[in-house]
A protein has these predicted regions:
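N-terminal accessory/capping or targeting/presequence segment of soluble
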Residues: 1-93
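Flexible, acidic/His-enriched mid-domain "rim/lid" segments that flank
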Residues: 6, 86-153
Length: 153
């Protein structure tokens, strides 16, 4: 089994940056490993659609298909792993529950390491939460480069 100590430390460092920058949530949206950020944080890959939620309070949530959920659970990195029947409503429901005001997503105009969210995945995600929530989206390039530097990546 893979050792997740490094990834646990990375998640801790990300949480500290979220607090420092007053960003409520870092949300990674992926499908079939499309976002290379998942190799760094959380360090768990998915075959199906997946989402990883990291709050500034230190809560960690994984949303995974039945096929992927076991790996996400066995990593020991998450407070809760939600197996979805309907990915879109599960992600939207968790966003509503968390009710963030500022959300960091993995997009960037200047840092390719922070630009793993595809336009198609982004538009699909936005279409499924439209009218349900309002929050400011910011780039993960506000903190990921510093976290990578501290963790020698």
């Amino acid at each position: 089994m893979k050792n997740f100590e490094f990834h646990n430390r990375v998640i801790h460092d990300v949480t500290e940056k979220l607090k420092e920058l007053d960003i409520d949530l870092f949300l990674i949206i992926t499908s079939e490993g499309s976002d290379k950020m998942t190799r760094f944080i959380p360090g768990v890959d998915t075959v199906g659609s997946g989402a990883f939620f990291f709050t500034k309070e230190g809560k960690r949530y994984g949303v995974a298909s039945a096929i992927d959920a076991q790996d996400v659970e066995e990593s020991g990195l998450f407070d809760e792993v939600i197996r979805y029947q309907d990915y879109d409503s599960t992600v939207a429901g968790l966003l509503k529950k968390l009710n963030p005001k500022r959300v960091a997503l993995d997009f960037s105009e200047t840092d390719t390491e922070c630009d793993g969210l595809t336009l198609g995945r982004y538009e699909y995600y936005k279409a499924h939460i439209k009218g349900q929530l309002e929050f400011l989206e910011v780039s993960s390039d506000l903190f990921i480069p510093q976290v990578k530097a501290v963790n020698h990546q």
